[in-house]
Amino acid sequence: MSTNTSKTLELFSKKTVQEHNTANDCWVTYQNRKIYDVTRFLSEHPGGDESILDYAGKDITEIMKDSDVHEHSDSAYEILEDEYLIGYLATDEEAARLLTNKNHKVEVQLSADGTEFDSTTFVKELPAEEKLSIATDYSNDYKKHKFLDLNRPLLMQILRSDFKKDFYVDQIHRPRHYGKGSAPLFGNFLEPLTKTAWWVVPVAWLPVVVYHMGVALKNMNQLFACFLFCVGVFVWTLIEYGLHRFLFHFDDWLPESNIAFATHFLLHGCHHYLPMDKYRLVMPPTLFVILCAPFYKLVFALLPLYWAYAGFAGGLFGYVCYDECHFFLHHSKLPPFMRKLKKYHLEHHYKNYQLGFGVTSWFWDEVFGTYLGPDAPLSKMKYE
């Protein structure tokens, strides 16, 4: 098998590898060292998926050499290396290091040039997805960037800082990963109020959707009500784009004010600073009520009453789909037809935060000239 020395890969324990042993999550090792995630390859394997699943979570060195089972060409090894290599199996000594790390992850250096993956540097090509969840070295990050110390409550650091706007905007969009759950914002009894699980959004808002649509269906032509519902969903996609581009990313219009920085941080900056924090990803209901109220009043002021009920139900349903989609783009293995959208959104975080504002689609990005394509430039990094 060819040797790849140009990647910085992650280290995994044997126990971790053994846990990835199903058709939906299949890892194998080669030469008891290289780890491959072959889940996507199962359906494409010429010899069928059963021959691979028999070795899920195990080493495939001997079976790869066994021509009686299946002949493997050099290109088969190259495909494994280029497309499915995700990390290395820890030795006993390395495993001991893993067990002393609360996040059970240690990044190992495998490249010949001595470079390491740095999430705070925007990149042309996204790294392996597993890398996005490697914990930031808090101490080194603070020493290098002189920005926020992940060991201490973040909001008070911003309020007490002497950051200039350009420095704050530059640094807040450079991704970090806390690695121990959610980083502290307040560090006191208010902390639980800053966290929202993904399931809260449908539980809180789908009943409201059902109520408003139910009122519309009872009081107007049902086919027309469904049409207005669909219009509401479509209008939401434009609102989604507009809010993300002009409210969440009001970076250029930020005043030189710590209160403004703190507001920006709570509204959206925190998500860019810690994009893989699963409890700071969907919108807290309280914040959504504040943002939604003007739109609710506008819809009911402009449209006949029951038209407004149907249209608002569609818009609210569109929001629920958006927030759930946003969560799963960050935290799930998605079917093939969703992978381009996932890549597109992650590039908004790790490549260029000034493009790619659509989350559920890139339609409005194409309309308004903010499409984040393969040739798009990296966001500038002014402060190192």
Swiss-Prot record:
EC number: 1.14.18.6, 1.14.18.7
Binding-site residues, Zn(2+) 2: 271, 326, 330, 345, 349
UniProt cross-references to PROSITE patterns, sorted A to Z: CYTOCHROME_B5_1, CYTOCHROME_B5_2
Sample GO molecular function, one term: dihydroceramide fatty acyl 2-hydroxylase activity
Cofactor(s) this protein requires: Zn(2+)
GO cellular component: endoplasmic reticulum; endoplasmic reticulum membrane; membrane
Cytochrome b5 heme-binding domain mapped to chain residues: 9-90
Membrane topology (UniProt): Multi-pass membrane protein
Effect of residue 319 to A: Maintains the susceptibility to Syringomycin E, showing no effect on catalytic activity
Location within or outside the cell: Endoplasmic reticulum membrane
Enzyme class: oxidoreductase
Result of changing residue 322 to A: Confers resistance to Syringomycin E, showing impaired catalytic activity
GO biological process, one term: inositol phosphoceramide metabolic process
Gene deletion effect: Causes a lack of alpha-hydroxylated very long chain fatty acids in yeast sphingolipids. This confers resistance to syringomycin E, an antifungal cyclic lipodepsinonapeptide produced by Pseudomonas syringae.
Lumenal side: 217-221, 303-304
Reaction(s) this enzyme catalyzes, per UniProt: an N-(1,2 saturated acyl)-(4R)-hydroxysphinganine + 2 Fe(II)-[cytochrome b5] + O2 + 2 H(+) = an N-(2R-hydroxyacyl)-4R-hydroxysphinganine + 2 Fe(III)-[cytochrome b5] + H2O; an N-(1,2-saturated acyl)sphinganine + 2 Fe(II)-[cytochrome b5] + O2 + 2 H(+) = an N-[(2'R)-hydroxyacyl]sphinganine + 2 Fe(III)-[cytochrome b5] + H2O; N-hexacosanoyl-(4R)-hydroxysphinganine + 2 Fe(II)-[cytochrome b5] + O2 + 2 H(+) = N-(2-hydroxyhexacosanyl)-(4R)-hydroxysphinganine + 2 Fe(III)-[cytochrome b5] + H2O
Annotated consequence of substituting residue 323 to A: Reduces the susceptibility to Syringomycin E, showing reduced catalytic activity
Residues that hold Zn(2+) 1 according to the record: 244, 249, 268, 272, 348
Effect listed in the UniProt record for changing residue 349 to A: Confers resistance to Syringomycin E, showing impaired catalytic activity
The family this protein is said to belong to: Belongs to the sterol desaturase family. SCS7 subfamily.
Domains (record comment): The histidine box domains may contain the active site and/or be involved in metal ion binding.
Function noted in UniProt: Ceramide hydroxylase involved in the hydroxylation of sphingolipid-associated very long chain fatty acids.
Name under which the protein is recorded: Ceramide very long chain fatty acid hydroxylase SCS7
